[in-house]
A protein has these predicted regions:
Chain B
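Terminal low-complexity/charged segments
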Residues: 1-155
Length: 358, 155, 302, 166
């Protein structure tokens, strides 16, 4: 009789409630099952009962960490349905905010991952660095979390001081490449905890439908920004980091390199950003129809399906968040690993349970 | 493999429509397991499955696929409330099917078990269907629990 | 006379009156250094003291009688035995008095971790149990180099008495043995990189997960005293000059202890936590290697 | 007031340990609470620590509108924290359910389930507001400020558990 250890729903390793039942032989994991739904607020149900304006605010609260991707994806769905174009300046502003959000999300993740391997000093360093990008987001939107930037037809606020954004982004790129990446990739204790741990093979990544950095660390070069560019991404140069190993260390490396790529994108976007209006005059009227919308969030592909009957309330909004796709891959990853690795492996997916549950 | 060749292989090229958000096609009598196997062998990524009630009292299921970056939306209709499961072919579909059971009490045939995903263990499936009439007029001060309590007092 | 001396070393120096504030000071220093290394300001000076008082003043959770009794007695035993170990430290090797031998000191130091293991099991919490079993595995692992190193000192000094060891051990043996002993301290104090027994992110607070209020306060107290006992053990063995005046001895004893706290804190702040198996392997290979070389040197010299 | 009393009060004021509980929150509040620990805000200066076990805590910080699925765990954790304890409702969700009001799976607001002592408004509150809220909680904890009258009589578990779904 192997003991079943239940982690959660409230566990210090987890910012959010979820349960993972781990079956152990000694310290070795022989089976695991994940239970979600603790954050289930039936947002999709609520969305069918609120108008589009209220829905934008509602979906901002799918997740407090990647709130911008949700409003962006929903706004794009509404724009596609209504057949309206977004002013060019707004497209660039959206890119800047989306990449700034990726920066803060990746730094947050790096911090939490360090905390999980007990490296508190590096956790603090990551969060210290993250405050720089939080300042940028606050300067642009007025908020540290939940930026309320997107609306159908454009963005709500202009970037008043592009120079400050550039300076902050350059400082982050500098600190990342000179301090964060060297420590993460060379420290012996970090390597001992990450390399070869929690491997997701390429075949499993496809079968489980992994997206985002998780898929890219397993050798799948998928990125919506490159494969189906939206907003201004087709006019910006960036690379999609891909690793073949599929272990925790590969996911660390992919995200670290993405931090640098995001800095590059923001720099280009600020420099290329044209003058002009940043939003349309009116809220659009949404005709009947259905539409899908996808963007690349920090954790991977975000998918929205919106169906409208022509009224001011959608008849169905379906959200497939990246963690919903990624989370099942945790099971093949933890099998055969030690119990001490389980929190780190699940964290290496950059899970967001409030996204998953909605 | 690209979306057009897939549509050709499925023999639904003529019915398919290309929109800004990808390819759309309605196949009322879709062989979902055949489709899933084809997609699996061609490495077309399973994106997700959307379920939504249709006006006729049945459900419209849309299988979303990513073929070389292009979105392929293959819709079908479920009138009897059950459809074949593809979770054994695509482990990625496991959670979505469980979720759809929680929301609309749809039955996916061929699964050994369909545990709840979002609801508590032992809850009746079909939360969205059961509560579809509720909450159209939301008073932010009144939560569903108050409504339930009021109902209990009345009865 | 010896009884008076014994009581003084138990209650005054290096015992309770000195050890309590010293333990709190060391805990504060470790947290402060950790905070400064992370670019933070860190806790105020009296923090561990206030933590202790606050915990004492909390209302204990009602528990079944036997469990409640055990959960009070075990941390008390840890406090008492650690205090006893401190009293035995050979700060004044020539002063005579109650001069216990090394075996007694080591067994008293070991009672603390043993109580923690038992305490984790009697708390009937899953995480307490896991923490306790990890603690047990680690105790086995680090005790291999710990005991070999002490044995090397004994072999070199030709005496089991603490004072004898402190005075007579040869320098090459002493240095190697002390390095091995220092490496064992982080395990006992749950410091990085050997803190697997209290890995908050995996098993909550390890064996103390279920302890609350006054009972937790006792564990905190035992923890503070362990700081003094372990750093003190190294400090007293590292300063063997027999005829220094007592104020000099005290100053050196305190200074070496504090220096050790600083070194250990910096090491903890700049490392990640190793897994249980990795920690155990480190002690059985590297730690034991150093200790064994000390032993070899001791025998060759003989 | 005796010397011992004033020592205990000072100790409580200077050593508040928190247990954070996410009852269906969107992460916004939670991440701002974590930000409080980091160099810019550094609440360890005030003796504040985020504890892993509810048994060690003095202050329970709850974020989120309380979903059906977290309800039972919430009540367990509340019972596990030894007295004296203070409950802080972090953000708008535990105060009013925010935009999740009306959802069939939300049973909040928090004060219907456990008594709430301090509300920290905001969606999410900024870290400085969170620190100020914890300071309010500490004042209640050490007895400087009387505990507020409960706004609701907490309801029993069964009535909540079936909320909206029966």
């Amino acid at each position: 009789m192997s003991p079943v250890i239940t982690m959660g729903p409230f566990h210090p390793a987890l910012e959010e409630p979820y349960k993972i039942d781990v079956v152990c032989e000694g310290e070795h994991v022989t089976d695991a099952s994940i239970r979600v739904g603790f954050n289930f607020r039936a947002i999709e149900w609520l969305a069918e009962r609120k108008n589009y304006t209220a829905d934008i605010a509602l979906f901002e609260h799918v997740c407090g960490i990647c709130s911008n991707v949700h409003t962006l994806c929903l706004s794009r769905a509404i724009e596609t349905l209504a057949g309206i174009e977004v002013p060019e300046r707004a497209q660039y502003i959206r890119v800047v905010v989306a990449e700034a959000e990726r920066l803060h999300s990746h730094l947050l993740w790096a911090g939490i991952a360090c905390e999980l391997i007990g490296f508190e000093t590096l956790f603090m360093a990551c969060f210290g660095l993250r405050e720089k990008i939080m300042d940028v987001l606050e300067a642009i939107s007025g908020n540290r979390v939940n930026y309320a930037m997107n609306r159908p037809g454009g963005v709500n606020r202009d970037i008043a001081d592009p120079g400050a954004v550039l300076a902050a982004v350059r400082a982050i790129a500098d600190a990342t490449s000179k301090q964060l990446i060297p420590v993460l990739t060379t420290d012996a204790t970090v390597r001992a905890r990450c390399a070869g741990v929690g491997v997701l093979t390429r075949a499993d990544a496809i079968a489980y439908g992994a997206v985002g950095p998780t898929a890219r660390a397993s050798g799948l070069p998928q990125d919506i920004r490159a494969s189906a560019p939206y907003e201004a991404y087709d006019r910006l140069l960036f690379e999609v980091p891909v690793r073949q190993e599929g272990d925790v260390f590969a996911r660390v490396v992919v995200r670290a390199l993405e931090i640098l790529e995001s800095c590059r994108i923001i720099e280009q976007a600020i420099e290329q950003m044209p003058a002009g209006p940043f939003r349309g005059d009116d809220y659009p009227k949404v005709p009947a129809g259905e539409v899908c919308s996808r963007i690349e969030g920090p954790r991977g592909e975000v998918f929205y399906y919106v169906a409208s009957d022509g009224s001011d309330t959608p008849t169905r909004v379906r959200v497939r968040t990246p963690t919903f796709a990624n989370m099942p891959t945790a099971r093949p990853m933890v099998l055969g690993q030690t119990f001490a690795d389980v929190p780190l492996i699940q964290a290496s997916l950059d899970p967001c349970y409030s996204c998953t549950d909605r | 493999m690209d979306a057009e060749s897939i549509l050709h292989m499925l023999d639904v090229e003529s019915a398919a429509e290309h929109r800004t958000d990808g390819w759309w096609v309605d196949v009322p009598d879709l062989d979902v397991r055949g489709l899933a196997t084809l997609m699996r062998t061609r490495e077309v990524r399973f994106v997700t499955l959307t379920g939504t009630p249709d006006t006729a009292g049945g459900y419209r299921l849309i299988y979303h696929w990513d073929a070389d970056g292009a979105l392929l939306n293959i819709a079908t209709t479920v009138s009897a409330g059950c459809i074949a499961s593809i979770a054994d072919i695509w482990p990625a579909a496991d959670w979505v099917e469980r979720e759809l059971r929680d929301y609309y009490a749809l039955v996916f045939e061929g699964r050994a078990e369909t545990p709840t995903l979002m609801l508590l263990e032992g809850d009746e499936p079909g939360l969205f269907s059961r509560t579809s009439a509720a909450g159209r007029e939301i008073d932010p001060a009144v939560t569903a629990r108050d409504a339930a309590e009021a109902e209990r007092k009345e009865s | 006379m010896t009884v008076v001396r014994g009581l003084i070393s138990l209650l005054v120096f290096p015992g309770a009156l000195f050890a309590l504030p010293a333990g709190w000071f060391m805990m504060w220093l470790q947290r402060k250094i950790n905070a400064r290394a992370q670019g933070r300001i860190g806790p105020p000076f009296f923090q561990p003291f206030f933590d202790f008082v606050k915990l004492l003043a909390k209302e204990p959770v009602v528990r079944p009688r036997l469990q409640g009794f055990l959960m009070t007695v075990l941390p008390l035993a840890a406090v008492a035995s650690t205090l006893g170990a401190i009293a035995l430290l050979p700060v004044f090797p020539k002063a005579g008095g109650f001069s216990g031998d090394l075996v007694l000191l080591v067994s008293l130091i070991e009672v603390g971790p043993l109580c923690a293991v038992l305490g984790g099991f009697v708390s009937r919490s899953l995480y307490g149990g896991i923490g306790a079993s990890r603690e047990a595995v680690l105790t086995l692992a680090y005790n291999v180099p710990f005991l070999i190193a002490l044995f090397a000192l004994v072999a070199s000094a030709g005496s089991f008495s603490l004072a004898g060891v402190a005075l007579a051990a040869a320098w090459p043996v002493r240095v190697l043995a002390l390095i091995a002993l220092v490496a064992c301290i982080p395990v006992k104090l749950h410091l990085n990189p050997f803190s697997a027994a209290s890995a908050e992110q995996e098993i909550y607070a390890g064996s103390t997960t279920e302890y609350d209020g006054p009972r937790l306060a006792l564990w905190e107290l035992a923890h503070a005293l362990e700081w003094v006992a372990l750093t003190g053990l190294v400090a007293s063995l590292a300063f063997p000059v027999a005829d220094a005046a007592w104020p000099v001895r005290v100053v050196v004893f305190v200074a070496v202890s504090v220096a050790l706290v600083v070194v250990l804190s910096f090491a903890a702040a700049s490392t990640a936590r190793l897994k249980l198996a990795q920690t155990a392997r480190w002690f059985l290979l590297c730690g034991s290697g150093i200790a064994l070389s000390a032993l070899v040197v001791a025998f060759v010299r003989l | 007031m005796s010397l011992l009393d004033s020592l205990v009060r000072t100790a409580r004021r200077r050593s508040p340990w928190l247990f954070h509980l996410n009852a269906g929150s969107c992460n916004g509040c939670d991440i701002e609470l974590v930000a409080c620990l980091t160099p810019r805000y550094d609440v360890e200066q005030l003796g504040i620590r985020l504890e892993a076990s509810p048994r060690h805590a003095d202050i329970i910080v709850v974020s989120g509108p309380v979903t059906r699925t977290t309800l039972e765990a919430l009540q367990t954790v509340y019972a596990q924290v030894p007295d004296p304890k203070v409950v802080v409702a972090l953000g708008s969700c535990p105060a009013s359910c925010n935009m999740f009001a009306g959802s069939p799976t939300v049973v909040g607001p928090l004060d219907r389930i456990i008594p709430v002592d301090v509300y920290v408004p905001g969606c999410p509150p900024r870290p400085d507001a969170i620190v100020a809220g914890i300071a309010d909680a500490v004042a209640i904890l050490c007895g400087d400020v009387p505990r507020p009258e409960p706004t609701h009589v907490p309801v029993v578990a069964d009535a909540c558990a079936t909320g909206g779904l029966s």
